[in-house]
Regions:
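A conserved beta-strand-loop-helix scaffold within acyl/acetyltransferase catalytic domains
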Residues: 1-27, 154-165, 169-175, 183-184, ...
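Glycine-rich acetyl-CoA-binding "A-motif" of GNAT/NAT acetyltransferases
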Residues: 1-5, 100, 229
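Conserved beta-hairpin
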Residues: 1-5, 207-210, 215
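Conserved acetyl-CoA-binding loop-helix of GNAT-fold acetyltransferases
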Residues: 24-26, 30-47, 52-55, 175-184
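Conserved GNAT acetyl-CoA-binding A-motif
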Residues: 45-59, 67, 189-199
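Conserved catalytic-core motifs of GNAT/GCN5-like acyltransferases
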Residues: 54-56, 72-95, 218-230
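Short, cationic low-complexity segments
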Residues: 119-149, 248-275
């Protein structure tokens, strides 16, 4: 048997890969095996010519997050309630008990990233600047579209974990009506949370964000290079209560991102409740 294990996972043709969760048996801990595996996988990703690597550490503890930060990764998104409550390490303390489990999205560019010129609503400019600064990428904002044209392109998927994924590849003139109908259909199927993504290079992003917020979606983060090599904006909608303060978060930059998401969620809830 092996005392540890880790792997790079990449979709066919993708320019990025996920560094899968590394596992070290208890008897072999304290020998820097986790750090050495991480370094080896980063070297392999560079050999493959990838643009970057990402990881999705849990928030029930900070061990994986600590390793990701040591490897130069920055937090770019927080996915709340995307795993069942029982999806926790066996035999470990569970400070997040009583709610579905959440994951971080950590990312590291393996080469100097090109400057980003994106479309985003003004209320998200500051947090987006901070995320891209942490990632080491220059950022500028484009003027929003005066009007949308054509039809939307959207893909919908329901995961066994109870998450409904809504992926816009193009934002068209009917996006607000389309999104409301999609959300209604997925909620009727009993999903526990909804995830929304759209390419930040689409001029219709501010319109989509307005429509999404009207449906109850709040900011979740950015997925660099996830949209056929381009970056995607991420938003979320939760069906069940979730206390962000229960999440175990290691780095100050990650805590700042989580605080913004918590604030955006509260602001949206107050607005939609008429407060």
């Amino acid at each position: 048997y092996r005392p540890c294990g880790a792997a790079l996972e990449r979709a066919p043709g993708a320019s990025i890969a996920e560094r899968g969760e590394a596992v070290v048996l208890p008897a072999y801990r304290g020998q820097r095996l986790l750090e050495r595996m991480t370094e080896r996988l980063t070297q392999e990703a560079q050999t493959l010519g990838l643009d970057g690597v990402f990881a999705q550490p849990v928030t029930v503890h900070t061990f994986s997050q600590h390793n990701d930060a040591r490897a130069g990764m920055a937090a770019c998104a927080l996915a709340l309630g995307v795993r069942p409550e029982q999806a926790t390490p066996k035999g470990a303390p569970v400070p997040t008990a009583g709610q579905r489990q959440s994951l971080l999205l950590m990312f590291n560019f393996l080469r100097t990233p090109a400057a980003r010129h994106i479309y985003a609503p003004t209320q998200y400019h500051e947090i987006l600047r901070k995320i891209y600064q942490a990632l080491g990428a220059d950022l500028s904002f484009a003027a929003p579209a005066t009007e949308l044209t054509g039809q939307s392109g959207v893909a919908i998927k329901m995961e066994k974990s109870g998450v409904g994924d809504i992926r816009f590849t193009k934002i068209g003139v009917g996006v607000a009506v389309e999104l409301r109908q999609i959300c209604s259909d997925l909620l009727d199927f009993g999903v526990k949370s909804l995830r929304l993504s759209a390419p930040l290079g689409d001029p219709g992003v501010p319109v989509l964000v307005d429509a999404a917020r009207a449906c109850g979606f709040f900011f979740s983060g950015v997925a660099p290079c996830f949209e056929d090599g381009a970056d995607a904006l991420l938003m979320q909608y939760l069906v069940e209560p979730l206390d962000i303060d229960k999440l175990q978060i290691y780095a100050d930059q990650t805590k700042e991102l989580a605080a913004f998401i918590a604030g955006d969620r509260i602001e949206l809830a107050d607005k939609n409740s008429g407060k």
